[in-house]
């Protein structure tokens, strides 16, 4: 992304339509970064907690350059806890953590929060993840069972978000269900994972 620009979508995402909407949005609001933020992790709306499973940026995006620099120079050679300790030593951990759960695992989120607070001035085009990729999660109050019922055993009615993000617990046993044909025709799983 730093050198060539483009779109990064984590493999644990389900695309329900082409990514043309990203280009349309970019033309409308020329930002140096497009992505999603998670409101439930955000305490300070001026610094939304940006997710890293979807990123779109033009070549040379200052945000991507700064984020990569922070990650490669301060995070990657440390464990998650060591990076937390590093931020505590700087006196910024509680500020950048906001409501991020599992900060030792989500060190890339912390690194982005650190550069947003310490450098700033970036042009971001962010959408609330709870309204799109996590909409099905929100409808099921973030429970795995309600999400799997929506993915596997409910026919798609109406519009889906262009992207559905599956977290690690959401993916657990999903292949088991698909391999055994445990889904209904017309469901998200049937349309976008099996290709019926």
Protein language model regions, located:
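A conserved donor-nucleotide-binding helix/loop in the catalytic core
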Residues: 1-9
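Glycosyltransferase-associated regions of secretory-pathway enzymes
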Residues: 11-196
């Amino acid at each position: 992304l730093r050198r060539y620009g483009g779109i990064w979508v984590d493999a644990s995402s389900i695309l329900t339509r082409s990514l043309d909407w990203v280009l349309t949005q970019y033309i409308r609001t020329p930002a140096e970064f497009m992505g999603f933020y998670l409101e439930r992790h955000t305490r300070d709306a001026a610094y939304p907690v940006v997710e890293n499973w979807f990123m779109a940026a033009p070549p040379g995006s200052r945000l991507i350059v700064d984020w990569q620099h922070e990650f490669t120079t301060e995070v990657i050679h440390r464990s998650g806890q060591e990076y937390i300790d590093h931020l505590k030593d700087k006196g910024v951990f509680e500020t950048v953590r906001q409501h991020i759960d599992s900060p030792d695992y989500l060190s890339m989120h912390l690194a982005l929060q650190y550069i947003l607070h310490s450098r700033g001035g970036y042009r971001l085009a962010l959408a609330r993840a709870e309204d799109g990729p996590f909409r099905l999660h929100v409808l099921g109050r973030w429970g795995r069972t309600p999400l799997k019922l929506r993915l596997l055993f409910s026919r798609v009615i109406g519009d889906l978000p262009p992207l559905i993000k599956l977290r690690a617990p959401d993916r657990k046993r999903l292949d088991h269900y698909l391999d055994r044909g445990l889904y209904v025709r017309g469901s998200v799983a049937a349309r976008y994972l099996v290709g019926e």
